């Protein structure tokens, strides 16, 4: 019995560190952002959730050279909010790391759908992206404007970073 109580107490102390009550929420159309998000969540011991679109994006949908592709149409429509197939509840988390690819210098509109569907009051948001070269830009700050009551801590492009790199970066933001 004493051993069980000690185990519970020590486990509770471990969860009071920088990543206690941290969730990683990601959207990935090709797998690049998914790998980064999973590596980061594993390093931090954070829970992870995938933003799943109702209609999965095809290669044709993602063709940024085609102005009629779904991703091009969504990015050019400020009111576009693609539907999400799964329910993600961040109510039990203090810090939410939102991961996404960069599309036309912005987060994909489905990420806005997620952000607008949550209660961010009293929560910290960190944004991480993957990019073909344009980097994070203003995408994190733009997203945080749609998260009422959030404490936006910052964001960074981690296309080539490891999970340990992400962990170190986030630790710095949460100090």
What are these regions (language model features)?
Residues 1-4:
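Positively charged n-region of N-terminal signal peptides that target proteins for export
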Residues 19-175:
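Active-site-proximal alpha-helix that buttresses catalytic centers in soluble enzyme cores
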Residues 7-15:
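Bacterial N-terminal signal peptides
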Residues 6-7, 85:
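General helical structural elements
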